[in-house]
A protein has these predicted regions:
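Conserved beta-sheet core of the metallophosphoesterase superfamily
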Residues: 103-203
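Acidic, histidine-bearing metal-coordination/catalytic regions of metal-dependent phosphoesterases
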Residues: 1-37, 171-204
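Core catalytic region of metal-dependent phosphoesterases/phosphodiesterases
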Residues: 8-9, 16-18, 23-115
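Histidine (H) residue identity feature
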Residues: 4, 22-25, 42, 62, ...
Length: 204
């Protein structure tokens, strides 16, 4: 792991985000009401969806809780997935951050601070109550996160009641919240614009 410096991207059209894939985690199907009959079906669906959307040269930020299992299993998953992969460490990831795993990511960090097309974005595993730039109106920073397993179809998380307090520029990029598929920067931008419009704000 290395200290993260802010990355700037002038074109966000091939940048993607995801979180909480929990590959190899049998019990996540029950815990989060995921619509799969086995962990094999779960894993293969997530891998298929990822590779259909993310190309080999695209950039994807994974915001933590990538997989369960051994170092070998992690490396096998990573070798099957498209894209230049960045990992923001989740609470379940620490035990598997071996040299063999880390070298399969462009970068591994507890937090990332990026800028895409002039938008400042904090990337964390957990949602924050406040973050730098949150109060700047139309020029507000974003915070993208995972961990809470938001679902548009079911209340599957203990944090459901607290999530009403999020800023309009925060969004859960977790796989439960996005049809078990990575979400693009442009799709996140559309979601955040809708949230901002609910307060009479809009960003082009």
């Amino acid at each position: 792991m290395k200290q993260h410096n802010k990355m700037k991207f002038t074109d966000g059209s091939r940048i993607f985000f995801t979180s909480d894939t929990h590959l190899g985690h049998t019990n996540i199907i029950k815990y989060c009401n995921r619509p799969f009959s086995s962990v094999e079906e779960h894993d293969e669906t997530i891998i298929k969806n990822w590779n259909e959307k993310v190309g080999p040269d695209d950039i994807i930020f994974h915001l933590g809780d990538f997989a369960f299992g051994s170092e070998k299993q992690w490396m096998n998953y990573l070798d099957r997935l498209n894209g230049k992969k960045y990992l923001v460490i989740g609470n379940h990831d620490w035990r598997n951050l071996t040299p063999g795993v880390c070298q399969r990511f462009v970068e591994v960090s507890q937090q990332m601070n990026i800028n895409i097309e002039g938008i400042h974005i904090w990337l964390n595993h957990f949602p924050f109550l406040c973050f730098s730039g949150a109060w700047k109106g139309l020029d507000a920073s974003w915070q993208l996160f995972g961990h809470v397993h938001t679902s548009p179809y079911a209340d599957s998380g203990l944090d459901h009641q607290r999530l009403v307090n999020l800023f309009t520029t925060q969004f859960d990029v977790g796989t439960d919240n996005n049809n078990f598929t990575p979400i693009s920067f442009n799709e996140v931008k559309e979601k955040i614009n809708v949230q901002m419009m609910s307060l009479g704000m809009h960003r082009n």
